[in-house]
């Protein structure tokens, strides 16, 4: 990818963004450090424990109950999932349930549409981190990205990243790939990385489309080893997870986590 474009994205002065031409798939050069997807997938799929360690055990249904959240946390402890991912209203419950277990709590912000004010996003992030959340999954301002307002996209992601990183938390940025063109996926991913994203995430699961191996490979090709790639949305089987890991994902978000891990063997 043209380094002049990257320099413009990454500088503190954001005005050059307006003059940057759209990023196309043909611009990709795999020169950001190697991520060996094949080796990572082979290691991760070597056993149920290794697979569980890269899965965000997720419950984001609007009608989720306390009992279901507590069950999610019990499963996260038993299977040693990467984290338990919940809606903000259940963050305190999850933090209490997972205290002292070594399993972190994740929660969503600006979810599921990415259409909140930056001030609201900051407040959500700060409140959740105070509760003990250690992984934040936000949704990129999709409409701003599609409108070409790259300053707003960068500012929004950077605001959340600064809060997360100040407290040692991770930030995953959902692009909602089902709603984006190839150029928008690449542009959104590049902006998110340079604004501080620790992971690019494919989907919220609420926009009519989920993770595909093609989108994961596209994001990994653009990101290289600069950040993680989280595949989420519609992942229900071990075959789904395998295809996405082999395409370049190093984190999976799923509500069918237990069933996926059990397909690989007993824990």
Predicted feature residues:
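Short hydrophobic "strand-cap" motifs at the C-terminus of beta-strands
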Residues: 232
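Charged, compositionally biased N-terminal leader segments and the immediate start
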Residues: 1-55
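Alpha/beta enzyme core
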Residues: 40-79, 83, 89-96, 100-229, ...
